[in-house]
């Protein structure tokens, strides 16, 4: 199997097969980061089987505006002692050659993804428990997922949608999340203060409180809209 064989259609079909295996008619889906694009695509391809979405520091497109925003947010941290090595690794076109090199790469760029780098050590056990695959990383680059831009189709999303983002996420930023919010009718936007790309790690109390409140609000709004139709 070649990396190019893995398409959004294939991933959406796999998700739907899992839904059927679980015996569920409709499912809520949550996607973090690039997985946000996957769950959005599922909602577009299988609207009758998607009950709602949680887009968590999610991405659905890349364009010049989002790239400029990311670069600006990166440069805001250029005086940090770890920045030069992290930025060099993040922008490098060279692919790690071994699993050890891949792990070193992840550890080098990780400070960029946190609001407070002290939280990296506090969450070390979570990162250690996360499976990493160099082959999967290479495959994701070769399948050119970044060329899939769902921006023009977001108006088609018609399920309850909660959009949550860390205030200092540089790669799936508040600007990007707000653009999603403006395109998805009836969606709710929540900002997790003092958090980066992993807000549930850095601000767990704030994150879970706001997400629970946000889910209740978006579901109540959906029921209200149905009743007044």
Predicted regions and their residues:
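Active-site loop/oxyanion-hole signature of alpha/beta-hydrolase fold enzymes
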Residues: 1-34, 209
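Conserved hydrolase catalytic core segment
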Residues: 25-69
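Flexible "cap/lid" loop of the alpha/beta hydrolase fold
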Residues: 53-93
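Alpha/beta-hydrolase
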Residues: 82-152, 159
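Short beta-strand/loop motif that positions the catalytic acidic residue
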Residues: 157, 163-165
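Short alpha-helix in the alpha/beta-hydrolase fold that links the catalytic acid
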Residues: 159, 173-182
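Acidic catalytic loop of the alpha/beta-hydrolase fold
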Residues: 168-172
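Catalytic active-site module of serine/aspartate enzymes centered on a nucleophile-bearing elbow/loop
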Residues: 187-229
């Amino acid at each position: 199997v070649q990396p190019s064989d893995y398409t959004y259609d294939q991933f959406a079909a796999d998700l739907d097969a899992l839904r059927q295996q679980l015996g569920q008619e409709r499912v809520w889906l949550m996607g973090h980061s690039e997985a946000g694009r996957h769950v959005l695509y599922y909602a577009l391809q299988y609207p009758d089987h998607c009950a709602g979405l949680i887009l968590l520091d999610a991405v659905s497109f890349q364009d010049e505006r989002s790239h400029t925003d990311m670069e600006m947010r990166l440069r805001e941290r250029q005086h940090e002692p770890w920045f030069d090595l992290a930025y060099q690794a993040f922008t490098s076109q060279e692919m790690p050659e071994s699993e050890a090199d891949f792990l070193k790469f992840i550890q080098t760029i990780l400070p960029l993804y946190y609001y407070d780098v002290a939280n990296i050590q506090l969450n070390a056990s979570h990162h250690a428990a996360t499976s990493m695959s160099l082959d999967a990383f290479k495959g994701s680059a070769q399948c050119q997922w970044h060329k899939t831009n769902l921006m023009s189709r977001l108006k088609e999303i018609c399920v309850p949608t909660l959009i949550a983002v860390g205030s200092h996420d540089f790669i799936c930023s508040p600007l990007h999340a707000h653009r999603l919010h403006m395109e998805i009718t009836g969606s709710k936007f929540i900002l997790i203060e003092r958090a980066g790309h992993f807000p549930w790690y850095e601000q767990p109390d704030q994150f879970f409180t706001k997400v629970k409140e946000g889910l209740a609000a978006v579901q109540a709004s959906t029921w209200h809209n149905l009743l007044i139709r």
